[in-house]
Structures are given as structure tokens and as C-alpha cells.
Amino acid sequence: MKAINAICIVLTTVMTVQLSFAQLSAKYKTYEQKWSKGLRYGLFKPANYDPKKSYPLVLYLHGANDTISRDITWYHESIQSENPTFVLAPKCTNPNQGWGNTWTDVHSPAMVKTLQVIDSLLARYSINKNRLYVYGISMGGFGVFSVLSKEPGKFAAGYAICGGSSEAAASKLLNTPLWIFHGSDDDVVGVQYSRQVYQEIKKEGGQVVRYTEYPGVRHNSWENVAREKTLHRWLLAQAKGKTTNSPHSVDGLKAKLQNDNTVNLTWSTPTVEPKSHGTVWYYKIFRDNKLLTEIDGDLSDFTDSDSNRGMHRYHMIAVAYNFKESTPSSFVNVTIP
């Protein structure tokens, strides 16, 4: 426990622009700073809020000692214009307790107050209780695992960046869609805190979890996450009680040996039914029946530049935003001289 507390009190610089409250409120007319029972929090309301409509809410949990108001991406017009969303950004001034963790059975005081604020917002605004989301960085990443394990069914989905969890909590994390991010060379929060709980979730049958590890990246993996172009769409595609179909199998997979002995794969983009669910989230590419890589679903080609000599067999699986997978594609063979 002491090791976890030591990790959580490290100062974390996050992937956002630092602004004063005055600057934020000037830039975003619907951003307010409020207090509730000693908890300071920022609340971003969608522009042109209409109580007759229903809106999602995203909860952001910051890292240790990072209590400054920040211009997070969820406020940006590029997201809000397509998906008007409430954003709640509470501030935790006690990094020794933080947002909680999965090594304890109770919420931290800051998380207790945050959940009370969420309940008050649900009562006051037209927020869809089936579309509550949470994400966090470092100390906030630990908080994501903590609140999802202690409040099963409250949140529709979440993502955790350079945080972590005990493996023992895996059984409580099986049913909430979760995307875990970590840098392989994290020098503040060891990658094992994310890697091992992911492996345990999968071992226990979890089907709605994804793990992305960035090779050679240290604690600042939030910079890589900021470049994940499907992240916001994936999160908002999740909703409690929502049912959707699986994507079609990848069609027309072809493999061509290039002059430099790399292998270029091309395919036709499959659709997902119903069409309203959107395009494929990502593809799994397999070489010789082993997972080679995962790539975004809007791509239709990939070059394998790391194959040894000999014959190699490739196939693919399409994964929808609901985690459902297609049947495997046909296999294609390539021989590298």
C-alpha cells in the first residue's frame, strides 16, 4: 500500500493546456467553477443546452497535485459540435488519498463527494444515466479502476491512462467497457499495474476490455493517447443496455511481396450492422496465427516490415465499437525469399 501511495503523489503533467479559471470561463461560456461540501470542481455544459434532450456526461479524474483548471479535449468544438456532452472535472487536494484505488474496499473522500455531485447533476439536468463515462490519468487512472470496481453498473464505460489496479479487482471489472493505456517504460507507475490486471480480466472471461501499450514510452503516455483518433467515438458509442451486431468478416484480403521484402496487405472495408453503429473500430492482424498488430478501422492497407524469410500466413479480424468481433477472414500466404 505504501508503494501505491508513493506512486499516486508524484506530480503528473497531463495532456492538456494549462489555463486559469478566468481564461477557461472566457474561452468557454458554459464552463463554471463550483464547490460542493469542500470539493472544488469544474462543470462544462453543452452549448445551447436543451432540457428536452438527453446528454452524456464525462467525468475526468486528474493526476496527483494537478488541480489547475485545464483545457481538456472534451471541451473542444470538434467534439462538442457532433456530440454535445457534459464534462465534470473535480479537484482532489489530498494526493495521499486521491481518487481511491482497488487495494481498498471504500471510496476516498474526494470520490464520495464526486459521486454526490454526479447524482445532483442527474437530478438537475437532462443527463442520460445510461451514458455516464469516466477517464483519468496517473492517480486518476487508479481512480478509474477504483470507481468502476466499486460502482458496477453506474458508468457505461471508461479509460485509464498510466494508472493501475490490483489483479484481485479483475472480477469486478468484467462487465464495464474499459480501454487501458500504458507506456512500456513508465518510470513513475510501473506498466505491470495495467498489464497484469488486463491479463487477469481476460483470464476471467472479460470480453469488453482493450489494452494498448506504447513501446519505449515513459509516464507521459497521455501524449500517445491524445493521438488515438477513435478514442472519443469509442467512448460515446458505449451505453448501458445497448445491443448491436457484429461486423462482417474482412473481405478481399490480399498480400503482396514488395521489392524490399516487406509484405503489403490490402482489403475491403467491412460494414457493421446496423449502419447507425458506425464503422469498424479496429482490426486485428495475425501472422502465422499470432497477433501481429492492431490498426484503426478506417484503414484498408498495412505493411509488415518485420517478417523473416520463409512462408507466412496472414488473416484478419474486424472489431466493432461494441467489442464484438467478426469471423476470421480468409487466409493469404506469402513467401519471403
Give the positions of each predicted feature.
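Active-site machinery of serine-nucleophile hydrolases
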Residues: 57, 64-113
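Beta-strand-rich modules
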Residues: 304-324
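C-terminal catalytic histidine-bearing segment of alpha/beta-hydrolase fold enzymes
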Residues: 161, 177, 181, 187-248, ...
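Primarily recognizes the serine-hydrolase "nucleophile elbow" in alpha/beta-hydrolase
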Residues: 123-124, 130-172
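Pro/Thr/Ser/Gly-rich low-complexity, intrinsically disordered linker/stalk tracts
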Residues: 240-278, 321-337
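Gly/Ser-rich "nucleophile elbow"/oxyanion-hole loop immediately N-terminal to the catalytic nucleophile
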Residues: 48-53, 98-138
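A domain-start/cap signature at the N-terminus of enzymes
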Residues: 20-57, 135-137, 142, 147, ...
